Structures are given as structure tokens and as C-alpha cells.
Regions:
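N-terminal core-binding DNA-recognition domain of tyrosine site-specific recombinases/integrases
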Residues: 1-39, 55, 76-81, 177-182, ...
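Short, basic (Lys/Arg/His-rich) helix/loop patches that form interaction surfaces
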Residues: 14-17, 71-83, 93, 143, ...
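Basic, Lys/Arg- and aromatic-enriched nucleic-acid-binding interface segment
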Residues: 17, 21, 36-103, 111, ...
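Catalytic-site neighborhood detector that most strongly recognizes the C-terminal catalytic loop/helix
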Residues: 60, 121, 226-241
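Basic, Lys/Arg-rich DNA-contacting stretches centered on the C-terminal catalytic core
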Residues: 98, 111-149, 159-163
Length: 241
């Protein structure tokens, strides 16, 4: 048990408490299995216990902060319109950036307001990318999009079609899918201009969860909408609400 505790303390100096807890849990299960197989008599990992979890503060924007940012984008400019719809879609759906980059017009039913999420995009370069199936079945989901989002998407589709008549990607301004650096850089620049705190692109997903929680939505339904995500993470985005 002493050796395991020494290992645990050493690990805690290098990694986050939550990561150490995961590794410790796996070690504990391994010892349990060893006991069943007759390879060990005791479980030292269970004897010393796990370290305390650390609540991670998750960053997000409120609706008001998001509106300040997108208000800086002029939809009369083709590229700015592309940025507008990209950030709008991420904030209003909670999609991961890879899921949004892989989204195609055929995945959206404007009549029913349903959006199908069935793939993600692995992007290496402009000419080297591929669709990847989600790691879990829960990532395959169909979500409802609100009337304003439908309107914004239809407007962007019409504008995009004039420049790129045969483009299948929703978030594209040049016939290729959105790169993994374009949106994060633009988001950081716009945040500075808008005078709001900077967030990572993934935080728009957390912002969507925060918005739904503030509207009184059921946390379990929010989790289903976001796909595989710990419910504690979903709730943690808006612990102040």
C-alpha cells in the first residue's frame, strides 16, 4: 500500500487531480480482478483510497456576451457572414467543432427543423481531410434547431450558393471544410474587439449548455442533445445559475 501511495503522490505532482483519480480507479479495478484470479490477496489501491476531485471551472459566454461578439460581424461581407454562421451554429446547437465542420446541407431538414449529427471531420490540410464515425453511439444524434437558427442557415445557404453553387459543406467559404485554426483565431480577435473575455472554441458548446440551463431545460435532455458528456460537466458550466 505504501508503494501505491508513493506512486499516487508522484503522479499527483505531474497531472491534474481528476486525471489521477481516473488512473487510480483503473488500478483499483485491476487489483480487484487480480484478487478474483488468485493473483493477489489485497487491493492496496482500494486501501489507500483515491485523491479528492477538483472542480474544474468551465468557461463560457452568456447570451449577451455572444451577441456583443457577433454584432461585430457584417453579413454583407461574404467572409464575415461565414464567420457569423459558424459561431452562431456552434453557440445555438452545442455541436463540437469537428461535428460542425463535417455538417453538410443534406444533414439539415428545414421543414421539420431537425439536424442530423452522424460524423466528425478529421482535418489535416485543405486537401487532406476525411469523415470519421463518432467514437460512441451517443454521438450519433438528431437535434432540433430553433426558428432563428433555421432562418440564419437558409440565408447563409442562399449566399453561399451564389459563390459556391455545388458546395455540400455548411461551414465553408471556399468549397473545403473549415480548418481547425480559422475559427479559434477569429473568435479570439472578435472577443478582444467586443471587450468580452476570451474563450476557446469548445467553450461555445459549454455556452450552449449554459443557455439551456438558464432557460430551465431538463439537464438530462441537455446531455442527450450534447451527446456523450458527463452530466456533472453539463451542470458545471452554469453552477452559478
Amino acid at each position: 500500500a505504501i508503494n501505491v501511495q508513493t506512486w499516487q503522490l508522484k503522479l499527483a505532482k505531474q497531472f491534474s487531480p481528476n486525471y489521477v483519480r481516473i488512473v487510480q480507479g483503473m488500478l483499483c479495478l485491476a487489483f480487484d480482478r487480480a484478487i478474483i484470479l488468485g493473483l493477489a490477496k489485497k487491493n492496496p489501491a482500494r486501501m489507500i483510497g483515491n485523491i479528492k476531485s477538483k472542480k474544474v471551472k468551465i468557461d463560457f459566454w452568456t447570451l449577451e456576451e455572444f451577441q456583443k461578439v457577433i454584432a461585430l460581424l457584417y453579413k454583407g461581407d461574404y467572409y464575415e457572414h461565414y464567420l457569423f454562421i459558424s459561431f452562431w451554429l456552434l453557440f445555438m446547437t452545442g455541436m463540437r467543432i469537428g461535428e460542425a465542420a463535417a455538417l453538410q446541407w443534406d444533414d439539415i431538414d428545414f421543414e421539420t427543423g431537425m439536424l442530423i449529427i452522424s460524423k466528425t471531420l478529421y482535418y489535416k490540410t485543405m486537401n487532406d481531410y476525411k469523415f470519421v464515425e463518432p467514437k460512441t453511439q451517443a454521438s450519433n444524434r438528431t437535434i432540433y434547431i430553433d426558428a432563428d437558427t433555421i432562418k440564419e442557415l437558409q440565408e447563409w445557404k442562399a449566399v453561399q450558393a451564389k459563390v459556391l453553387p455545388n458546395c455540400g459543406f455548411v461551414l465553408s467559404y471556399n468549397s473545403t471544410p473549415t480548418s481547425k485554426t480559422t475559427l479559434p483565431r477569429a473568435l479570439e480577435k472578435l472577443a478582444n474587439l467586443a471587450g468580452v473575455h476570451r474563450i476557446k472554441i469548445h467553450a461555445l458548446r459549454h455556452s450552449h449548455a449554459s443557455l439551456l440551463i438558464s432557460m430551465g431545460e431538463n439537464p438530462l435532455l441537455i446531455q442527450e442533445r450534447l451527446g456523450p458528456e458527463k452530466i456533472q460537466t453539463t451542470l458545471g458550466t452554469s453552477g452559478h445559475l
